[in-house]
Amino acid sequence: MAGGGGLKFVEMDVRNDDAYKLAKEWFDEVVFSVKFQDSIDKELLREAERNYGLVAILLVNPRLSIVKEAVQRFKQNYLIYVESSDLRTIRYSIERGVDAIISPWVGRKDPGIDHTLARMMAKKGVALGFSLRPLLEASPYDKANILKFMRKAWQLTNKYKVKRFITSSANEKWHIRWPRDLATLGIIIGMEVQQAKAALSTYPDIILKRLK
């Protein structure tokens, strides 16, 4: 699918093969995320790269040593994402210069970043990923809280000019949404229309240029 109007839409975080195949029909480029927690399997990464091309190492609630290893050994060839609600892990990951922190508000009672962390992200070039999937899986009460924290995180992102992207973070095919639907999520949390489009096109393209 072409973005239209010269835009190229990018899905930055897909975690399942069926979801990837559907996303490829709707987006111009798709990043396949390979999830690791305790150790990084090089052969699994190579296989993913052969199958999907653009690959991210997704570290979920990782030990700090795994974040360090990922950045030192693998950043040249892969994007590095961290998904964690632990502030120490988030801060360390930003300091190390991972490519993105994804949905740090999930599992917390706050946005997961503050003014200090947002400034650090801008300085280090670390993006913030706004993920749809937690909203799809949440109860109505939790959904309202997640949206509240996403709005606050967006305000900080906008204020400090942090890189950003909107993504499905799809674990299953049914999590995938059209670019227009993801842009609508951006508008709901306070983005202007052009900002939402940029979070699906301009900023992802900037992030991906590191690998090209």
From Swiss-Prot:
Source organism, top-level taxon: Archaea
Keyword hit for Oxidoreductase: no
Keywords: Cytoplasm, Endonuclease, Hydrolase, Nuclease, tRNA processing
Quaternary context: Consists of a catalytic RNA component and at least 4-5 protein subunits.
Name under which the protein is recorded: Ribonuclease P protein component 3
Molecular function via GO: ribonuclease P activity
A Pfam family of this chain: RNase_P_p30
Family: Belongs to the eukaryotic/archaeal RNase P protein component 3 family.
Source species: Pyrococcus abyssi (strain GE5 / Orsay)
One GO BP annotation of this record: tRNA 5'-leader removal
Swiss-Prot/TrEMBL catalytic activity: Endonucleolytic cleavage of RNA, removing 5'-extranucleotides from tRNA precursor
